[in-house]
């Protein structure tokens, strides 16, 4: 143990404030396979050296406090402290740098995303010595990830449950998101599922409001999907949002969904909280329910480049906490999402092993071992003209979700669903025949219009719709 980090009581106690870097900046440290590693984008206050700022992040997110305390002598800081082990500049940003911090595994409760985040992204984000702080990535070691159940079922089990293979799944968010009665809501669900969609969805803020109580919605939606299943011969689902004001109420809704025999429920995992989400995920695995996750509130946390937390971290947290689907941006629609960044965290959701790749924002190699994968959901401002790009970008293991792009069809909900299903089938067939969807996608859609009047009408309505804004989150 070096003199700088000696903590034995025999050394004696000297009160006062000391530099964080004397204890928590350790560039000679060799990271362990069991360490949780973090990459922080740090913007220190003027005059604060990078080493001191990086050490402050390590200290305040682990064992440190602002002054020396005599109880330091009652434990071994070398065993429990976080360490800033590397600092690298951010190209083009003179006042920013990336601080790499290693945390010993014993700092965290097993199977608890709540505890993990309370430490790593807790009080340190309000630290006065820092102008801004952003958590860019985490490396979760197998020794820790194996303490989590993870997704209730995962990609392959979901495909087996639905008996659907070789293509992305199709969904639709029912609109208007608020104000419909339960019966009219169920009617919209039925029309969309009958037209060819695999799923329909409650919007994230549909819970149990005066115009539509949750139990009524659940009953009418279950009736709609059973009727659509009988007519189409396909397994259908509706994401019944179980999010509620208390965990007890959330579980009551999930239990009722199971009693209705529906295949899937939904949760808003950030507004609902990780403790509630993990509780629901465990119930879903035990009772055969798929779990769709909405990321409402994520942009409050992840959209600013200098402060907060990147969505790739929230995606990893969700995979550990549990969910079979999660919204992940579209690249081409109305919501934020640069292509390489989006594909980086899509791989972190789906794959077992993801190599470090800074060109896609992946700071650490991530080994999920046997944890099931999560289907990314592309949703937000997409329509039939986006189908070739979405198929090419996200591949088969995804859910493509068209709300306005289904319900906005001039002939109604069912024709809107038909248009999306025909466009998807045409794109998948063209891809399987070796055609380049990135180059020939529009031609593929136009050809399909010749034998689908529903698709032709949709193409005419949305031919001029574009969302041309620069992305904020870029590499």
Curated annotation (Swiss-Prot):
GO molecular function: magnesium ion binding; monooxygenase activity; ribulose-bisphosphate carboxylase activity
Active site annotation, chain numbering: 175 (proton acceptor), 294 (proton acceptor)
Post-translation changes: The disulfide bond which can form in the large chain dimeric partners within the hexadecamer appears to be associated with oxidative stress and protein turnover.
Catalytic activity: 2 (2R)-3-phosphoglycerate + 2 H(+) = D-ribulose 1,5-bisphosphate + CO2 + H2O; D-ribulose 1,5-bisphosphate + O2 = 2-phosphoglycolate + (2R)-3-phosphoglycerate + 2 H(+)
Proregion positions: 1-2
Residues where N6-carboxylysine is found: 201
Gene Ontology BP, a term: reductive pentose-phosphate cycle
PTM sites of type N6,N6,N6-trimethyllysine: 14
Enzyme Commission number(s): 4.1.1.39
InterPro entries cross-referenced by the UniProt entry: RuBisCO (IPR033966), RuBisCo_large_chain_AS (IPR020878), RuBisCO_lsu_C (IPR000685), RuBisCO_lsu_C_sf (IPR036376), RuBisCO_lsu_fd_N (IPR017443), RuBisCO_lsu_N_sf (IPR036422), RuBisCO_lsuI (IPR020888)
Cofactor note: Binds 1 Mg(2+) ion per subunit.
Residues marked Transition state stabilizer (site): 334
Location, primary (coarse class): plastid
Residues the record lists as binding Mg(2+): 201, 203-204
Metal-binding listed as a keyword: yes
Binding site for substrate: 123, 173, 177, 295, 327, 379
Modified residues (N-acetylproline): 3
Keyword Cell inner membrane found: no
Similarity field: Belongs to the RuBisCO large chain family. Type I subfamily.
Further facts: The basic functional RuBisCO is composed of a large chain homodimer in a 'head-to-tail' conformation. In form I RuBisCO this homodimer is arranged in a barrel-like tetramer with the small subunits forming a tetrameric 'cap' on each end of the 'barrel'.
Subunit annotation: Heterohexadecamer of 8 large chains and 8 small chains; disulfide-linked. The disulfide link is formed within the large subunit homodimers.
Function: RuBisCO catalyzes two reactions: the carboxylation of D-ribulose 1,5-bisphosphate, the primary event in carbon dioxide fixation, as well as the oxidative fragmentation of the pentose substrate in the photorespiration process. Both reactions occur simultaneously and in competition at the same active site.
HAMAP family listed in its UniProt record: RuBisCO_L_type1
Protein name: Ribulose bisphosphate carboxylase large chain
């Amino acid at each position: 143990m070096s003199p700088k980090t000696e903590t034995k009581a025999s050394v004696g106690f000297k009160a006062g404030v000391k530099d964080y870097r004397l204890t928590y900046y350790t560039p000679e440290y060799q990271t362990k396979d069991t360490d949780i590693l973090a990459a922080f984008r740090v913007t220190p206050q003027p005059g604060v050296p990078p080493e001191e700022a990086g050490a402050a992040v390590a200290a305040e997110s682990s064992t440190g406090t602002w002054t020396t305390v005599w109880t330091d002598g009652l434990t071994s800081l070398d065993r429990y402290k976080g360490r800033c082990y590397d600092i690298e500049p951010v190209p083009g940003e003179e006042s920013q740098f990336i601080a790499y911090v290693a945390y010993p595994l014993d700092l965290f409760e097993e199977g608890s995303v709540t505890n993990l985040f309370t430490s790593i992204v807790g009080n340190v984000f309000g630290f006065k010595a820092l102008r801004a702080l952003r958590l860019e990535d985490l490396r979760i070691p197998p020794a820790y990830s194996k303490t989590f159940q993870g997704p209730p079922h995962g990609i392959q089990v979901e495909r087996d449950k639905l008996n659907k293979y070789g293509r992305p799944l199709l969904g639709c968010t029912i609109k208007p998101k608020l104000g419909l009665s339960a019966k009219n809501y169920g009617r919209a669900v039925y029309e969309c599922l009958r037209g060819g969609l695999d799923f329909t969805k409650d919007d994230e803020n549909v819970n149990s409001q005066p115009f539509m109580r949750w139990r009524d919605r659940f009953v009418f939606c279950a009736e709609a999907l059973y009727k659509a299943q009988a007519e189409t011969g396909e397994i259908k689902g509706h994401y019944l949002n179980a999010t509620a004001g208390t965990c007890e109420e959330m579980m009551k809704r999930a239990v009722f969904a199971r009693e209705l025999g529906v295949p899937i429920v939904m949760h808003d995992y950030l507004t609902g909280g990780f403790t509630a989400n993990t509780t629901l995920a465990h119930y879903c695995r035990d009772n055969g329910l798929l779990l769709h996750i909405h990321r409402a509130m994520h942009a409050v946390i992840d959209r600013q480049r200098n402060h907060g937390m990147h969505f790739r971290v929230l995606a990893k947290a969700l995979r550990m906490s549990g969910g079979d689907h999660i919204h992940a941006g579209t690249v081409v629609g109305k919501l934020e999402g640069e292509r390489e960044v989006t594909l980086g965290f899509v791989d972190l959701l789906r794959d077992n092993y993801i190599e470090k790749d800074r060109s896609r924002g992946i700071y650490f190699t991530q080994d999920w071992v046997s944890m099931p994968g999560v289907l990314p959901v592309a949703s937000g401002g997409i329509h039939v003209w986006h189908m070739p790009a979405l198929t090419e970008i996200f591949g088969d293991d995804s859910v493509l979700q068209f709300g306005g792009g289904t319900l906005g069809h001039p002939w109604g909900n069912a024709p809107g669903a038909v248009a999306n299903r025909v466009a998807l089938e045409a794109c998948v067939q063209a891809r399987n025949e070796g055609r380049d969807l990135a180059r020939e996608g529009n031609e593929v859609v136009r050809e399909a219009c010749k034998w689908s009047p529903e698709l032709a009408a949709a193409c005419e309505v949305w031919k001029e719709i574009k969302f041309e804004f620069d992305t904020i989150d870029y590499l």
